[in-house]
Amino acid sequence: MSEFKLTTVEEFEEATARLLETGAKVGADAWQFRVKNQTPHCKFGEQGVCCRICAMGPCRITPKAPRGICGCDVHGIVGRNFLKFTAAGAATHSDHGREICHTLYCAKDGGNYQVKDPEKLIRIAKEWGVETEGKDIYDLAHEMAETGLMEYGKPFGYQRFLDRMPAGQKEKLIENEIAPRAIDREVSTSLHMAHMGCSSLPEALVKQSIRCGMADGWGGSMMGTEFSDVLFGTPKPIDTEANLGVMVEENVNIVVHGHDPSLSEMICEYADSKEMIDYAKSVGAKGITVSGVCCTSNEVAMRRGVPMAGNFLQQENVVLTGACEAIVVDVQCIFPALGPLSKCFHTKFITTSPIAQMPDAEFIRFNAETAGENAKAIVKMAIDNFKNRKPELVHIPQLKQKATVGYSVEAIVKVLDSVTNSQVDETGTTKPLLECITSGVIRGAVAMVGCNNPKIRPDYAHIELMKKCIANDIVIIASGCSAQAAAKAGLMDKSAKDLCGAGLKRVCELADIPPVLHMGSCVDISRMMILAAELAKDSGLQINQLPVVGCAPEWMSEKAVSIGNYVVGTGIDTFLGVDPYASGSSEMCELLTEGTRKWTGAAYTVEKDIDKLVDLMIERIEEKRTALGI
């Protein structure tokens, strides 16, 4: 057996440099060049001190002009911008959940979409107080879909999933006016508060930012996660591979990119069919390879083992290989640059959602009723495009690593059951993990999430932080592009246990797990909140007492701000490697890094130096252990 070895960031960069050489031959643009054209960035924007919410401005705050034309000071301007940032992210993630609810409503026996996990559907229905006895599973699915959709606009009450929190936490959120009500109400209220002539008090703006984020995390995202499991199956550990080397030169290569599993699941279904594989062979290919980018990739990897071609800043690379017949996208994190780039090659750039329409793309409207027909047409289009490849432009970097993915909360509990003495101990709980933490075998956990950002060397922060954490016996749970960075490096290979401290290594060996656990897409950060709640309930603690922190070292999107706010709102300290455009206001900085503790028991830490950031995380975990006397 060959010795296990991580793939380094330097190797990632060498592969990218070679692909950019191909791009130069055809005059292709790439993000590396656009970053240079946009540098330096606007300092007013970076500090959050520019206001353009009315037509009296734009106003920008300087020492000579400390207030906007309306009289709003820097603290109000930064606060409003932060709230609008959050609202856009919460709307986006929650709309994903809404789409999944609609897909669930369209599910039927023998249809395009079916209920793959009826037990989970019944469990959630009982949790919500919906009668299940004697009901056809699809009647129940439709009722639950409608009930879920009501969470977006119900006139009264709070998000149903808040009842999953430990005793007293929901009540504290209500008391502090940060418990989320209807999802759309929180987004609408946020935009109203940020309108000219409304809120300019930083404390009120931060409170609503947390409330809006909580509507995402404990509302839209949680429904998106839970109902995706009902439709497509609850993830369990499955082996896959990651990095550009998963593309196969002799095959038709279809890359799915975006966030909605409704599209990618159907593409995979038809690409796996004998009819389409035979058709691919008839045009000279040996078969069909579907791989993924971003969170769509995470979705199909953890349920089907579909390989991961890369994360956010690798989306152009899959086209630059010259071997991508079609890049099929749904919503979010998609570069508009993919259209012009694809025209430099033979690649078909196919958009499928009216929410994400782009120039230089072929638009095939995808919906639940015609999903099979749409998917088949897309796969056929990719196969027909195989003959248009330009062999002189084909180069697939031979970089890939093995990864074990698919650690849903249910899967983690099952893994814990495997190391439990069922004759003595209770099964179906997180108590074995708690025992490891209490004894000090594992010091704590870090939820590593988020994007890539050209402001930080891509993937470097994710990988280096993870390596140092696991060496210090801190287990990592990861999602989104952070999870893909880990997978590309090899940190989701079970052999990576050899990089751990002695305690975590022993746990990995006993439980047969990698030290970095793949929990899914960015929407699936809701799984992390559920896991934290279960740990708190099983230990008799509140979430903010657990030796657990969150980290988004390379975040870039509005969704990430919403996520950060619901992680802090849940009671988990959150560490950022990129400033959330709040540095221009001392009051906002104080509120975000300390003031929120009085409402949630958690706050942000912003540190751009990666070595300092990881030390601060470890220090915080140890502080929590000391407070618990463990």
Regions found by a protein language model. Name each.
Residues 2-630:
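Anaerobic metallocofactor- and corrinoid-dependent redox/one-carbon enzyme cores
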